[in-house]
Every structure is written in structure tokens, then in C-alpha cells.
């Protein structure tokens, strides 16, 4: 059991990155505006949310474990995770996809049949107390109502001033009860 430790479960699409099918209308619109994808891999174009480097520093400084979880299909999840690993998210202790999700009570606007991320699953798989696990997602509908959640704004590549990662780090800092003079406090004091 990882007593005293914390586990952060990151949603992928909309939270850490934004991915589009490389032939999608959204991608064409972004390209017409001069907003170029950070990477194209297979059938997908990826836009990396600003300040991911700060999040990585936060995770290392606080020595917290993390998982990557998408409601996407398993074959696509592998592509998304590989992209995040190339950005430095290579110390995750696991990755999960749609097949690991549960059905919610009410169908959401999604092609996925399973979309709820139950923290009991990852807590049990990795030996954590579920109260020390938190989901970071851009959708309330993908969480269980009685589990820890940071619901962040969905990343939009058009928003050049996106500070979603900074906001996530501030909430995580509070969740884990950090008392150190860590990167979030240093950045907050210099802002």
C-alpha cells in the first residue's frame, strides 16, 4: 500500500493536450488561422497545452505518482500516451483507456459507450487509498460524484494565454497539502 502517497489521474484530451483527426474540420480551421499542430502522428494532430513543463516540475518536486487516462479507444490511447511520453510524461505508473471506464447514468455528448473514470479502479490497481487519489479532467461527466476531482477548463489551441496548467498545479498543491516553498509558490510570489 502506498500509504501517505498521492495519485493524480490525468485526463489526456482537453486537459493535457488537444488532439484532432488530421482530416478534421477543426484542424483545417486552425491551420487556416496559422495555428500549427505541435505534432502529427498517425491519424492525429496534437496541440500541447502551454506550461506542461511546469506541471512536470511540479510532479517531480512533490514526488507524486500519476496515471494517464483517456476515454479514447485503447489503440488510440497508446498513440496519445506515446506523445505525452515524448514530452516528458514518461514516469507515469500506468495508462488507461475507454475499456477501463464505466458507463454513466446519463449518456453524454460523446461517441464513447464507457466514459466514467472510477478512481477506485486505479487505487486498487496501484495500492493507493482512494481518498488520496484525484482526477484532473475537463468534464464533470467523466467522474464519480463522491470522488476527488479538479475540473479544469478544456484546452483550446486558439487561446494563446491559456493558464490551465498553472491553475491545475495550484489546486494540486492545495490537495496534497504542500508546505514547501515549491515551484507553484515561487511562481505565485513572482507573478
Language-model features: locations:
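C-terminal cap/substrate-recognition subdomain and adjoining C-terminal extension
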Residues: 73-191
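Alpha-helical substrate-recognition element adjacent to the catalytic core
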Residues: 1-109, 186-190
Amino acid at each position: 500500500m502506498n500509504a501517505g502517497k498521492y495519485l493524480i489521474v490525468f485526463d489526456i484530451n482537453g486537459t493535457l493536450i488537444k488532439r484532432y483527426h488530421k482530416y478534421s474540420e477543426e484542424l483545417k480551421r486552425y491551420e487556416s488561422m496559422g495555428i500549427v499542430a505541435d505534432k502529427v502522428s498517425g491519424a492525429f494532430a496534437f496541440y500541447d497545452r502551454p506550461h506542461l513543463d511546469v506541471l512536470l516540475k511540479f510532479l517531480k518536486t512533490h514526488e507524486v505518482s500519476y496515471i494517464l487516462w483517456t476515454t479514447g479507444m485503447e489503440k488510440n490511447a497508446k498513440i496519445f500516451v506515446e506523445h505525452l511520453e515524448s514530452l516528458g510524461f514518461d514516469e507515469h505508473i500506468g495508462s488507461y483507456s475507454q475499456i477501463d471506464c464505466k458507463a454513466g447514468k446519463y449518456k453524454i455528448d460523446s461517441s464513447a459507450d464507457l466514459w466514467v473514470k472510477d478512481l477506485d479502479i486505479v487505487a486498487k490497481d496501484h495500492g493507493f487509498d482512494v481518498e488520496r487519489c484525484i482526477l484532473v479532467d475537463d468534464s464533470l461527466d467523466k467522474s464519480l460524484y463522491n470522488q476527488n476531482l479538479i475540473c479544469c477548463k478544456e484546452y483550446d489551441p486558439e487561446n494563446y494565454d491559456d493558464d490551465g496548467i498553472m491553475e491545475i498545479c495550484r489546486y494540486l498543491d492545495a490537495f496534497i497539502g504542500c508546505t514547501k516553498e515549491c515551484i507553484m509558490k515561487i511562481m505565485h510570489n513572482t507573478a
